Amino acid sequence: MNPKRSFQALILTLHNYWADKGCAVLQPYDMEVGAGTFHPATTLRALGPKPWRAAYVQPSRRPTDGRYGENPNRLQHYYQYQVILKPNPSNLQELYLGSLEAIGLDPLLHDIRFVEDDWESPTLGAWGLGWECWCDGMEVSQFTYFQQVCGIECSPVSGELTYGLERLAMYVQGVDNVYDLNFNGREGAEKISYGDVFLQAEQEYSRHNFEYANTAMLHQHFIDAEKECLALLAAGAPGDSSNNRLHKCVFPAYDQCIKASHVFNLLDARGVISVTERQSYILRVRTLAKACGEAFLLTEAGGANWNREAA
């Protein structure tokens, strides 16, 4: 399949490229998240000493970015392609440029520039040294060296690559409106466009996010998710015995942290959170994320009982 002809071929090409580089090609996380970074394959797996390589597509929701389907390149629901490489390889930039070449962007024929742009996620308590990648004057992706996630220092440092799939597809297909993207690579009566798949949903979710979402219910959902996250962390906490030193409920707890984050974003879109309240909500979600990160380090996947020399 030609990645220049369809949205789905672009994704499949990236899957094949990163699979060949040793990544586990994972599925999207089945929850509402604001970015691919929220997937536990990145947020949690970036912590601890164990090596990790994964790639996946993640549907991402940013309610405040909705424009009722009237903006040609701004969406409240879009797709990111995420790659996490731990420890960070010395040739990360070379690998990234290779991925661009795989999808038809030859670095020798295009003006590829890296613009310094350090990344931060306040709700995840995460930040890293990063660069935007611009191709012929348009940002197409970003790569970051994680320094901290969940308020915890990353050791070793992970390399993260994030591709904005719609923007990248618009560039390689040469279209100016995201809804005109060829989705399935066919023409004529068999052609399915991005708009055929997503335009109605974009219009309806914009109404939901800005006009219809029940704010009283959302406030309660946030409180419930916060309480459940903390309760699950307490329930799964290690005991004093030698047979009970690992945490037993990190992923369910982290799901509740994700829920709280999305509910906060919906409340923000509805315009019912003041400036001071906004900072309070961010701090509350970050507190949950930090607690989940600390608990993850007490699991096998997080490196507890891991022998670096034996690995």
UniProtKB/Swiss-Prot annotation:
Residues forming coiled coils: none
InterPro entries documented for this protein: aa-tRNA-synth_II/BPL/LPL (IPR045864), Gly-tRNA-synth_heterodimer (IPR006194), Gly-tRNA_ligase_asu (IPR002310)
Residues of the signal peptide: none
Keywords: Aminoacyl-tRNA synthetase, ATP-binding, Cytoplasm, Ligase, Nucleotide-binding, Protein biosynthesis
GO CC list: cytosol
The protein's Enzyme Commission number: 6.1.1.14
Reactions performed catalytically: tRNA(Gly) + glycine + ATP = glycyl-tRNA(Gly) + AMP + diphosphate
PROSITE patterns: AA_TRNA_LIGASE_II_GLYAB
One BP term from GO: glycyl-tRNA aminoacylation
Leading EC class: ligase
Annotated GO MF terms: ATP binding; glycine-tRNA ligase activity
Disulfide bonds: none
Major subcellular location class: cytoplasm
Compartments where located: Cytoplasm
HAMAP family noted in UniProt: Gly_tRNA_synth_alpha
Protein family (similarity comment): Belongs to the class-II aminoacyl-tRNA synthetase family.
Quaternary structure and interacting proteins, as annotated: Tetramer of two alpha and two beta subunits.
Protein name: Glycine--tRNA ligase alpha subunit
Organism expressing this protein natively: Rhizobium meliloti (strain 1021)
